[in-house]
């Protein structure tokens, strides 16, 4: 119970910090300033798989800092450094699955766990009125980091169609 109180206090502080970033309409300020919307170009240049560590593997091993919202033995949840909505966080498995299209039958429980953690974190972040889950897969899906990740976006009215 004490951990839940600490988590709730941290989430309130994080929401205040996000509100102070000046998010208005389509312009979103992230840790590196205004996003450039160039994810497609990044995806075109990304290397699908390989031995090199990804930015997410560096966050997992704590060699790269991140604003971590949740962690357990199977996954990690952290804020996106270039948010596309007032609330934008990523849910990643600790198991290095490069793409959702490369997930195996044995990953079924893990994939379900990622979705449940996304739901629980969205609730903790105050997204009770709705949010969007996004998984980009491959170059044409604009995947720029080849470590499976679920984007959770909310905090404003999202538009349709998304792409």
Curated annotation (Swiss-Prot):
**Which enzyme class?**
hydrolase
EC id: 3.9.1.-
Q: What is the activity's pH dependence per the UniProt entry?
A: Optimum pH is 7-8.
Pfam hit, one: HIT
Q: Which UniProt keywords apply?
A: Acetylation, Apoptosis, Hydrolase, Lipid biosynthesis, Lipid metabolism, Mitochondrion, Nucleotide-binding, Steroid biosynthesis, Transit peptide
Source organism superkingdom? Eukaryota
The entry's cellular-component GO terms read:
cytoplasm; mitochondrial matrix; mitochondrial outer membrane; mitochondrion
Catalytic activity annotated for this protein? adenosine 5'-phosphoramidate + H2O = AMP + NH4(+)
Q: Name one GO biological process term.
A: steroid biosynthetic process
The family database entries (SUPFAM superfamilies) matched by this protein are listed as: HIT-like
Q: Where is the HIT domain?
A: 55-163
Tissue specificity here reads: High expression in liver and pancreas. Expression is significantly down-regulated in hepatocellular carcinoma (HCC) patients.
GO MF entries = adenosine 5'-monophosphoramidase activity; hydrolase activity; nucleotide binding
InterPro entries documented for this protein: Histidine_triad_CS, Histidine_triad_HIT, HIT-like, HIT-like_sf
Effect caused by changing residue 149 to A = Loss of adenosine phosphoramidase activity
Catalytic residues (UniProt): 149
Q: What is its main location?
A: mitochondrion
Its subcellular locations are: Mitochondrion
Where does this protein hold AMP? 63, 80, 136, 142-145, 149-151
Q: Which PROSITE patterns match?
A: HIT_1, HIT_2
UniProt family annotation: Belongs to the HINT family.
**Tell me, what does this protein do in biology?**
Exhibits adenosine 5'-monophosphoramidase activity, hydrolyzing purine nucleotide phosphoramidates with a single phosphate group such as adenosine 5'monophosphoramidate (AMP-NH2) to yield AMP and NH2. Hydrolyzes adenosine 5'-O-p-nitrophenylphosphoramidate (AMP-pNA). Hydrolyzes fluorogenic purine nucleoside tryptamine phosphoramidates in vitro. May be involved in steroid biosynthesis. May play a role in apoptosis.
Q: What is this protein called?
A: Adenosine 5'-monophosphoramidase HINT2
